[in-house]
Amino acid sequence: MPCIQAQYGTPAPSPGPRDHLAGDLLTPELSKPTMDLASPEAAPAVPTALPSFSTFMDGYTGEFDTFLYQLSGTAQPCSSASSSASSTSSSSATSPASASFKFEDFQVYGCYPGTLSGPLDETLSSSGSDYYGSPCSAPSPSTPSFQPPQLSPWDGSFGPFSPSQTYEGLRAWTEQLPKASGPPQPPAFFSFSPPPGPSPSLAPSPLKLFPSQAAHQLGEGESYSMQTAFPGLVPTSPHLDGSGRLDAPVTSAKARSGAPGGSEGRCAVCGDNASCQHYGVRTCEGCKGFFKRTVQKNAKYICLANKDCPVDKRRRNRCQFCRFQKCLAVGMVKEVVRTDSLKGRRGRLPSKPKQPPETSPAHLLTSLVRAHLDSGPSTSKLDYSKFQELALPHFGKEDAGDVQQFYDLLSGSLEVIRKWAEKIPGFAELSPGDQDLLLESAFLELFILRLAYRSKPAEGKLIFCSGLVLHRLQCARGFGDWIDSILAFSRSLHSLVVDIPAFACLSALVLITDRHGLQEPRRVEELQNRIASCLKEHVSAEAGEPQPASCLSRLLGKLPELRTLCTQGLQRIFYLKLEDLVPPPPIVDKIFMDTLPF
């Protein structure tokens, strides 16, 4: 162990009673022998300016490494650690007033006053003893590969007047400090001060040493320094009291600098690092993405526990229900999250789509009327070539000609109805499968409705879509009793005095309705609602009655009657198939097979 001797001359004796204690050899149990303070030999016994060992002992209960400490009245330096033992023995023999002091389990490197070196000398030095101009220049442990960071003067261990951070002996010393077991008391290890008299080799030191008894744990982002290891080590200033202690507690550099590690930089949901606010609350990127996905997908979570699962950085992914509930509890706003239709449109809200003119009720009504007029024969081009008003009915079984006429009238009407349907706004946008399904399902109903509206039941005239005019008796053998039901429906329909726009809307509603097997029933329903609204507005404007709803209800009441007449038509086709006089056309046969209710 290095030998430490005073390098000053004999100063004036200190008047304090502790400075006059004899340097007796202490036992390993750290007990001091009693002595008479009034003895005249005690005054010049220790004429050195080094701190008394009672200062070391007060407040410290740890173990000390054993080494010899020689107090000498002369100022002869010892040059190496190997000459310490011989110097101690010779000094004991020549100076009876001085005594050797032995400590157990305690090591001190460079913690004694001496000449302070500048920052350049401190960098070039390799031992802790050189920094203070110690007479004993024994090298201290160091780590050559470690490069100390460039810190400010007060961010180092002891500032520019302290050993470098490569000094590992200091860390070993701090690890041997005892744990505080009781109420914290102000520690007082040793306080360095210059000798009473001015010394040319010692400059006033601005440092006070108050090592903490509790180990200081470094926070995230902090570097190891004496300020963090020993918070009590603070520079003395005129603002401090005589003891060199601060009146207020010393805060760490992390709290003073407002680092992101503070509470304002933490996620309000899980406590992770958060750089900015998301959806109204400071949150991390993980909680922001979780909240966004949950709102956009409208996800529903279930808690497998008691809905009070802990949500922190480590356990935030365990329960999605509790995590989302905490997001709402801390104030995250769901309405701020953009929906799928707004992705990629920052700073813009969707403008209200302007209703195109072709989808307006007036334009829809005009299109329906035009489609109806184009699909029907004009009154100036009716074909009366086969009309026989006075023809006698042929009672008995129908022949092949009557059955073939029946099939031809049905097949011709199907092509006209198909062309009419293609002119209805919105029908062409439906899928081809839905178009065929709607046409085949509503064909017989449309055939009956259109025939009944064009015909003149009072005169017994039946006007078909091709312009052919036949008398009721001419159709009796082919249509059977079904023709009489059609004429009865025609009379009831004409009694309502239905104009062309209302009839065009009613015909479209017969086609555009819900059918079993539709691929896009939603689109069919939307188109049906538009046509129904158009019909309602027209009837309300043209009826001229106090209660226009009654006229609309009577008009819509004809739709169930059409279903009944459609069933009678299927029965007639089935009967003709059983007679097997003429094979039905493929399109009629397909319609029959697809629309059978059984």
UniProtKB/Swiss-Prot annotation:
Cofactor(s), names only, from the UniProt record: Zn(2+)
Keyword Nucleus assigned: yes
Matches recorded under Gene3D superfamilies: Erythroid Transcription Factor GATA-1, subunit A, Retinoid X Receptor
Subcellular location: Nucleus; Cytoplasm, Cytosol; Mitochondrion
Modification sites for Phosphoserine: 341, 351
Region of interest (Required for the interaction with RXRA), ranges: 299-361
Molecular function, one GO term: double-stranded DNA binding
Record-annotated NR LBD domain positions: 360-595
DNA-binding region ranges: 264-339
PANTHER family from the UniProt entry: NUCLEAR HORMONE RECEPTOR (PTHR24085), NUCLEAR RECEPTOR SUBFAMILY 4 GROUP A MEMBER 1 (PTHR24085:SF1)
Subunit description: Binds the NGFI-B response element (NBRE) as a monomer. Binds the Nur response element (NurRE), consisting of two inverse NBRE-related octanucleotide repeats separated by 6 base-pairs, as a dimer. Interacts (via N-terminus) with NLRP3 (via LRR repeat domain); the interaction is direct, requires binding of NR4A1/Nur77 to NBRE-containing dsDNA and lipopolysaccharide, and leads to non-canonical NLRP3 inflammasome activation. Interacts with GADD45GIP1. Interacts with STK11. Interacts with IFI27.
Similarity comment: Belongs to the nuclear hormone receptor family. NR4 subfamily.
Protein name as it appears in the record: Nuclear receptor subfamily 4 group A member 1
Species for this entry: Bos taurus (Bovine)
Lineage, opening ranks: Eukaryota, Metazoa, Chordata, Craniata, Vertebrata
